[in-house]
Amino acid sequence: MAAPGDPQDELLPLAGPGSQWLRHRGEGENEAVTPKGATPAPQAGEPSPGLGARAREAASREAGSGPARQSPVAMETASTGVAGVSSAMDHTFSTTSKDGEGSCYTSLISDICYPPQEDSTYFTGILQKENGHVTISESPEELGTPGPSLPDVPGIESRGLFSSDSGIEMTPAESTEVNKILADPLDQMKAEAYKYIDITRPEEVKHQEQHHPELEDKDLDFKNKDTDISIKPEGVREPDKPAPVEGKIIKDHLLEESTFAPYIDDLSEEQRRAPQITTPVKITLTEIEPSVETTTQEKTPEKQDICLKPSPDTVPTVTVSEPEDDSPGSITPPSSGTEPSAAESQGKGSISEDELITAIKEAKGLSYETAENPRPVGQLADRPEVKARSGPPTIPSPLDHEASSAESGDSEIELVSEDPMAAEDALPSGYVSFGHVGGPPPSPASPSIQYSILREEREAELDSELIIESCDASSASEESPKREQDSPPMKPSALDAIREETGVRAEERAPSRRGLAEPGSFLDYPSTEPQPGPELPPGDGALEPETPMLPRKPEEDSSSNQSPAATKGPGPLGPGAPPPLLFLNKQKAIDLLYWRDIKQTGIVFGSFLLLLFSLTQFSVVSVVAYLALAALSATISFRIYKSVLQAVQKTDEGHPFKAYLELEITLSQEQIQKYTDCLQFYVNSTLKELRRLFLVQDLVDSLKFAVLMWLLTYVGALFNGLTLLLMAVVSMFTLPVVYVKHQAQIDQYLGLVRTHINAVVAKIQAKIPGAKRHAE
């Protein structure tokens, strides 16, 4: 690495808005740097090439043409050999040397937007290719005489600031013609892959460059596989020990070996020694409509951040080619091994202005063709990525407000990028540029024509989406005729595409719109869609009562299932039906007691009577055994009978008790918990009441309970417990029916009995002092 400079080697302030600095430090060399346009004192042992006079002449020429011209973008190469290199440059394009003497980085910088730092060291120059070498122009006369160059690229007068993650921050100059100053046309494809396009204007560069009279005595040889680029100052002697900087730029593997150079201050020793190759950025500007040149904006202390503003007169169409950047803050994805090289991607992705204008004019027709052939999901998902690549970077920058002004001022750039065919076909990779067109550029379409075409395309897409939604809603509601009247008529091809897409979308949206009531209707939607069309006018009255019947069908089925269950008793139910709770359902018990189903009530009543009479004659164990044998004899006999019948009739009806075998009779945990809680409540209430009566909490209640027990002694002497239970069962099945039939007479007699009982109780309470006091 080079030794750090002396403290006296400080950079002086800029001489003007277009002045640039040139400084490169060799090994052990300390050279003072002077601004351009000033006359430095020649050092000992070095001839004065007389550049001071020419610099003063260029300075006077610049002062005369200051307000009418503006400095172009210049290529700047700086050395990082100085220890105090500033890291203020946000984006640098660097190539590290092998021997570790110093790292050279090159960037395109506009001095209007970025004021130079006090410790920045770099040099500027306009490259011209002469016999395979690019030489820095040292005089205005040499700069004004360009060598053999390639065909001119159609220029554009861009007013916005374009910045990217790849290290390029530029403000294009006010020029109507952009020239690539490269000499050999045969080496065009080789040079375009990894060389900068110097954007300048030959007739206006004489006042831009005023070089320092004392340049570095070092020759930087960029040794590539194809070309050798050397920077040789005119009038300065050759150094004895040149510091070559080698870069492994191979055109076939340029994208695979390209890496993004980190900031200069973050470079480690290994990174400085290893060569780092960075893919350059190619920026091509195409002029659509020329406009009047604006005056040069002077950089004053009050207006240091003034940049070019977008003009309403121009509508630029800009295509920026960026190298892949794998840094976290970059939106450009890194390149992979499968991507094509720079030359291949440029040949495939470059389009001319004729093709661009033709694609814009055919945008409306392409929109309908794409509607007929819907794109796969992968291409539709890649569209936001393409738009993200073509858009400006999202990293924070002090010039973001200037970059946003270009977007807000010229909306045609965003509209052109939104073209579905141009966004996917014209941007296959990260490197895209307009091809060279010989002769004058063709007359492009006016901004109003472009805007009208794009607007019609967007409106056609919106109308097609509206009609698709209308067709989807027509199957579930009656709002489709209204929407079709509001929407404009479409072409037959678009309508056919809509009909094809309607079936696919209906399968996805029908379950959510129609509900679970029609599980299989949306599957037959394409075939059943044309059928209700002709039947809709005469069948409006018939369709309206059917649609509300759909949610009512489950309710009717449930009610119909409950009524036969109550009338016909327990029958074969499905496996998903709730388990029958015999004698536990209140409504079912009421139906049994009131003989609403005579057959079912008779079976239950006879079973109880048989059980009770059996218990009166036999013990409980004998009754259980006899009942089990009777049930088994009945079921076995029926099973054999059905089997013989099926064998004779040669039928296969299956098991005769199959429905009962599949019937779910298990009690769930919730049901058991429910009845257990109910039983617990009654048991606890009974225990509390008995405790209160036996402990004479209330004397009257305890006396009543005593009288009841005295009467039960007489009942027990007359009847057995089973007889009482039998009488209770008979009364339970007979009294409700008798009460319903003779309710009026029974109520009358019950009223008389209640009155007589109340009178007797009142007399008893009058004779008992405690009872009277309690009644008061």
Swiss-Prot record:
Post-translational modification (record): Isoforms RTN1-A and RTN1-B are phosphorylated.
Signal peptide, first to last residue: none
One annotated Gene Ontology cellular component of this protein: neuron projection
Positions where Phosphoserine occurs in the chain: S327, S350, S352, S487
Pfam families, alphabetized: Reticulon (PF02453)
Residues spanning the membrane: 603-623, 705-725
Reported tissue expression: Expressed in neural and neuroendocrine tissues and cell cultures derived therefrom. Expression of isoform RTN1-C is strongly correlated with neuronal differentiation.
Localization annotation: Endoplasmic reticulum membrane; Golgi apparatus membrane
InterPro entries: Reticulon, RTN1-4
Source superkingdom: Eukaryota
GO biological process, one term: endoplasmic reticulum tubular network formation
Biased composition range(s): Basic and acidic residues: 497-511
Reticulon domain sequence ranges: 589-776
Compositional bias ranges of the Low complexity kind: 328-341
Region (Disordered): 1-101, 137-168, 205-245, 285-580
Keywords assigned by UniProt, alphabetized: Endoplasmic reticulum, Golgi apparatus, Membrane, Phosphoprotein, Transmembrane, Transmembrane helix
Topology in the lipid bilayer: Multi-pass membrane protein
Annotated function: Inhibits amyloid precursor protein processing, probably by blocking BACE1 activity.
Subunit note: Interacts with NDRG1. Interacts with BACE1.
Protein name as annotated: Reticulon-1
Lineage: Eukaryota, Metazoa, Chordata, Craniata, Vertebrata
